[in-house]
């Protein structure tokens, strides 16, 4: 029997992806996936549409989210799977994060507009109704105005964190993020923590603290993790018996990442499902 294809990190137009949740499900089916997780930034607004879209497809949906957290100057993303989307603490924190993202984006656009012909309306035109607004939408507006050839180039140039236009964002600590996901019955997995140029995002000591707080997994097989970083993460996962995941971090046309380019072993997915108490996978 061929091994199941499992991709546990994707984004829809609810956050910074380019495909609506239903369209993302259709793309996952075309890509031959058996299981896909929807993990929009700080939002569960796409769960309902994606859950309806899997009906009759044979695809399994793992509802999730990519929660923004911050450790000093480092942005640390925390994937949460199969948590209760109505958990009061998590609902309050994600609402605060979305509001913070919005005001941050407004301030960045104000700075850019001093040097470039860019308006807030240009940015809004790049986002779907109700989307969690952020820097990717500013990048798309810069591309539309001809100031960058694609989203990646916009982030490497005008939106680079060392540019004069950068604005840091407010977010809870990774420890708080882990605890919130666990309290909501979910499974916290730290996302791509050995990203090229920022590795390590979390020190070995920081990992110890996260594990003590309830971290259950680490996303290792991801195109942005360095080779050396993956080796270090595998050792940490072995030492702490953490769930090991792999994924595409698919954004539709927003990034070159392709569905299923990295995957999660079925037995690791089973560990996630077994550990969750807040929600269940949706089987199409």
Question: For each predicted feature, which ranges?
Answer:
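Extended substrate/RNA-proximal surfaces in nucleic-acid metabolism proteins
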Residues: 53-211, 263, 268-284
